[in-house]
Amino acid sequence: MNTKPGVFLECEERTKRNLEALKRSLRTKLGDSFDTLIGDQACVYVTGSMGRLEMGVKSDLDAYTVRFDGSGEDSSSLEEAVRHANKEVGLPPLDSNGKYVKTVSASSLLDLLGSPRDDSEGVLTKRMLLVLESRVLLGQSAYDKLVGQVIDAYWQNDDLHPKGYQPFVLVNDIIRYWRIPNCQ
């Protein structure tokens, strides 16, 4: 028996339909280039209301593309496929002309962990969105690897505390992500 109120069920069902439609559109658009652009070295994932399965009728797509190989492979066709799928599914235009769809390296989500630039370059937000509220569109194996590496990065000091290591850096990042700025 489902105990969710009707409005939440509607949002969840709408989101699942949109996720499947986006996946189909992306696969079709990429066609023969899928293995080259995605394979097991890249992924496309969504966050925001789609990642939380709570899309409203006016919700937009918050998609990210990440590569592991750092090969310099031109990912513009992958980014264009995301834009095309967004339009084909009938979602609102991407925020900021789709700047978040721009492909980033997996290492960029890890290299700044704990540094002052983590916030200023928006990496903390990308990392927290990935861990807390993301769903994969394409590249399941790369997505799983990415999430695993991000989580593992928060346990990098566990060998220094063999009895009862607590991931305080992760807890701190979650707090920083959710903190409301102190406006004066």
Residue spans for each PLM region:
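Long, non-coiled-coil amphipathic alpha-helical linker/lever segments
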Residues: 1-7
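Generic detector of intrinsically disordered, low-complexity, polar/charged segments
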Residues: 3, 45-48, 136, 161
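Extended alpha-helical coiled-coil/bundle linker/stalk regions that scaffold oligomerization
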Residues: 65, 177-184
